[in-house]
């Protein structure tokens, strides 16, 4: 029943009385005038009540619409967990939310203003095909259409029924932009009336759909405030829900005008914290799926404010996991109904009967637990046939034998003690293990003391290595070592001197032997104090490299020079190469040269033994008989004719 009329001029003060109407009431608020008619004579219908709302606008028509609500008794103490009330069920988001709830197995009470406008919703539900449905049940059977006007507080309570969850999807229509009171009446006042009714009905969960940018100013979401401050009124509705004390969940979706249902095939859903997003798009179907998931999992959506958009770069993630990442404003508190039901089920008469015969068993249980505490950590103590890996046991060696015998005994003790798997024997095992730990302190650090066949790496030891051993092992040399080293030094020096004596002359043999004996006598105390630097004194078979011994450089060298030179005075040439002077000197006697060379040879021989060749000649020509110094051609003497 609808009627329209126009009002012009001054504000309305009186309306002619109608014969068939009683209780005429006129209310005025700002520029909007609401005329309410209540009570009819002889038009009452059992179980139904009719009311007419007449909205008066300054420059628009007056519409009178009748809303029929079926009154149903409600029990505040009992709520049906599978029953959900959806406000705004004929809208874009509400109709899809109803279908998603039916897919999850919920029973839905769809709140609409007019049952005639719910025909498309009922037809879409009939075309649904549920995957998991009981035999003989259809989705339409779980749907209830309830006519209710949220601007009237009296009609909301009967429409809720025993619903445990309320989903509010209402909002001012974008088509009625000229209605400046739309955001206030629908987005705030109607939502607040629904919150108050839900509080009095003590519902378990309330889910509210608002928009991005309701709390914090941000572009481009703030542009919506040009539509008569719609974001401000939505924020007022959120505050009313938060202050009510209900278990709430607030969903702030992005733009839903352009995206279609196929939008989810290319764009995945993303959730963000409150006051973080100010732009983005999401489809109505994706928002409906989120609302249905929140109704099914109240512990995941408890006291959360979620902002929803869809992006192509976002990964495909289940909604449950996305909700887990959003923190809750307060800790989750389960509904009291579940706790009462569990308390009634727990006391069963059969439980105390089963506990009486088990009472003596509980007395026997404590000693078993005490025996389990000293359980050995080694698995070899639990099995008789299982032996620990053993290494080859060496024979007794010097001072390490007592420690090895202790360790061998310690490894054999747990095997004998665990022959019978009795809990008493296991208690003795830890005592043996403690002894092993204490005895390990006496273990030698060297592995060569453990195994007989294992020898340390050794270098080849020489035959006469007394001096080397005395230096490395003993603190100082002994008398026997000094005697051996002195004899070796004597043999070396005597052989060197003998070769030089045979080649020079018999006259020089006496001083050479004297020099050799003096060298050996002086070298003997040196070997007792310091280690010889030459390796040839250590090994008997090792000989030093020998160079060809030159012949005596006495009269032979002088004779050869005179014979080869064309002019007399060949000795002058030899002395010239040695001294570097061209002056002639008288020739020396042939006996003086061998004496000098023998002195040089003896000094060289003594220098080889003492490693101090002080009188060694600078010229190499005196050492070798066949080696001659270079000679320059001498000019012939000039004769005066």
Curated annotation (Swiss-Prot):
Membrane association type: Peripheral membrane protein
Q: What subcellular locations does the record give?
A: Plastid, Chloroplast inner membrane; Plastid, Chloroplast stroma; Plastid, Chloroplast thylakoid
Q: Where does the record place the region 4 X 22 AA approximate repeats?
A: 376-638
GO BP annotations, alphabetical order: protein transport
Pfam families from the UniProt entry: NAD_binding_10
Q: Start and end of the transit peptide?
A: 1-63
Q: What happens when the gene is disrupted?
A: No visible phenotype, but loss of membrane-bound LFNR1 or LFNR2.
Stretches forming sequence repeats: 376-397, 444-465, 532-553, 617-638
* Primary localization: plastid
List compositional bias (Basic and acidic residues) regions by residue number: 359-372, 435-444
User: In the UniProt record, does the keyword Iron-sulfur occur?
Assistant: no
Q: Where is the composition biased (Pro residues)?
A: 630-641
Q: Where is the composition biased (Low complexity)?
A: 393-402, 485-528
Regions of biased composition (Polar residues) lie at 599-612
The segment annotated Disordered runs over 328-641
**Protein name, entry field:** Protein TIC 62, chloroplastic
Record lineage:
Eukaryota, Viridiplantae, Streptophyta, Embryophyta, Tracheophyta
Encoded by which gene? TIC62
